[in-house]
Swiss-Prot record:
Homodimer. Pathway: Purine metabolism; AMP biosynthesis via de novo pathway; AMP from IMP: step 1/2. IMP binds at D12, E13, G14, K15, N37, A38, G39, H40, T129, R143, N219, T234, R298. Coiled coil: none annotated. GTP binds at residues 11-17, 39-41, 300, 326-328, 409-411. The keyword Cytoplasm applies. It is found in: Cytoplasm. Keywords: Cytoplasm, GTP-binding, Ligase, Magnesium, Metal-binding, Nucleotide-binding, Purine biosynthesis. It comes from Paracoccidioides brasiliensis (strain Pb18). This is Adenylosuccinate synthetase. Binds 1 Mg(2+) ion per subunit. CDD domains: AdSS. It catalyses: IMP + L-aspartate + GTP = N(6)-(1,2-dicarboxyethyl)-AMP + GDP + phosphate + 2 H(+).
């Protein structure tokens, strides 16, 4: 049976930790979409692991891992990340990771183009990670991209990459990019990549009877190309639909859809953020939560939990259970606000607006809850939480239409987790 872990907000919710927990009993862990723009941090045995394109299931020694068809793979980053994991003690990691031959190749060229496209946007920048994800997906949609399987074929990458570079040069003029160097490196990758590349259809068929398949979502619903705060989104489908499509999953095999919700809100980069706190509250959340992007190192924008957004996310992803993360970051607040509705021009909005400029204008309606002013870090049992912390969790459950909060994160370590059964 399949369990899917999805971000319910703007990303950085802490998906890696619940994935790590669930992967201990999983036989297969998969990434369905996105690329090395994603960032997951896991602390295990006092060692911090940073994941970008690789699935977090690599930490568990019995878990096989797949980078699926819906992803874009920057090959140098794939090997760099794999080497970093092995250097930290995951010696057999390279024996348990595979890539779909239908995944797209993200070139250094795409990163150069990403920067040029952002520069053209000037004051209306999307705020991308600069990793080339958008241009890579654009080339995929335009049917001129390169698939991972084609890297193994002699001469294919070189001819396609030269054509891509020529096209971008016609568009942007001279590029600060070494075409010959990238061509040379992919000659080497042709052999080096071969042990990792699989036919995903055959691979998934082989694992069709696997008792436990875990899908690790990247980014989050509000960054989805269709359902997110467009155009301030990533270039892939980050929700339930993207997971099914990117891994050719049988929908009837899905047992659990885990929505990961941070106990407050954060966002990296540009785009609307109705509950953002550009004040002492935001600074306190940023400082206490150490809110810096794993991929970019950028300071995350911080604000109160937004239940309008979370309900919208739930309506699209159909969560069966919630993992609430970083509850301990709210320990020192006298009172905690939660957004429960939006108004525009004095009228209550019935749904989450599609237009980014409308989201910038909404008036947020909050409910104020009392804080608990006591330490919850490291708590592992529900009864160990202060009464007001329990009430905060129960309030969120009600606002989510009764979707149960099964796991509550209370710190960075693997065992800093409450499981409510």
């Amino acid at each position: 049976m399949v369990t899917i872990v999805l971000g319910a907000q703007f990303g950085d919710e802490g998906k890696g930790k619940i994935t790590d927990l669930l992967s201990q009993s999983a036989t297969l862990c998969c990434r369905a979409a996105g690329g090395h723009n994603a960032g997951h941090t896991i602390v295990h045995d006092d060692i911090t692991y940073d994941f970008h394109i690789l699935p977090s299931g690599l930490i568990s020694p019995d878990c096989i891992n797949l980078v699926g068809t819906g992803t874009v793979v920057h090959v140098p980053s794939f090997f760099k990340e794999l080497d970093a994991l092995k250097a930290k003690g995951l010696k057999d990691a390279d024996k348990r990771i595979f890539i779909s031959d239908r995944a797209q190749v993200c070139f250094d060229l795409h990163s150069v183009v990403d920067g040029l496209e952002e520069a053209i946007l000037a004051g209306k920048k999307v705020g991308t990670t600069g990793k080339g994800i958008g241009p890579c997906y654009s080339d995929k949609a335009s049917r001129r991209g390169v698939r991972i399987g084609e890297v193994l074929e002699k001469g294919v990458v070189e001819s396609k990459l030269r054509a891509l570079e020529a096209g971008y040069r016609r568009q942007f003029g001279e590029l600060k990019y070494d075409l010959e160097d990238e061509v040379k490196r992919f000659h080497e990758y042709r052999t080096k990549l071969q042990p990792y590349v699989v036919d995903q259809m055959a691979f998934m068929h082989k694992h069709r009877s696997s008792p436990s398949v875990l899908v690790e979502g990247a980014n989050a619903l509000l960054l989805d190309i269709d359902h997110g705060t467009y155009p301030y989104v990533t270039s892939s489908c980050t929700g339930l639909g993207g997971a099914i499509q990117g891994l050719t999953l049988n929908p009837t095999s899905i047992k659990s859809i885990v929505g990961v919700v941070k106990a407050y809100s954060t966002r990296v980069g540009s785009g609307p953020f109705p509950t953002e706190q550009n004040n002492a509250v935001g600074e306190k959340l940023q400082r206490a939560g150490r809110e810096f992007g794993v991929t970019t190192g950028r300071r995350r924008r911080c604000g109160w939990l937004d239940m309008v957004m979370c309900r919208y996310s739930n309506a699209i992803n159909h969560y069966t259970v919630i993992n609430l993360t970083k509850l301990d970051i709210l320990d020192d607040f006298d009172e905690i606000k939660v957004a429960v509705a939006y108004q525009l021009d004095g009228k209550l909005l019935e749904s989450f607006p599609a237009q980014a400029d409308v989201l910038d204008k909404v008036e947020v309606k909050y409910v104020t809850l009392p804080g608990w002013k006591s330490n919850t870090m490291g708590a592992t049992k529900w009864e160990h939480l202060p009464t007001n912390a329990q009430r905060y969790v129960e309030f969120i459950e009600r606002e989510m239409g009764g979707v149960p909060i099964r796991w509550i994160g209370t710190g960075p370590a693997r065992n800093h987790m409450i499981e409510r059964i």
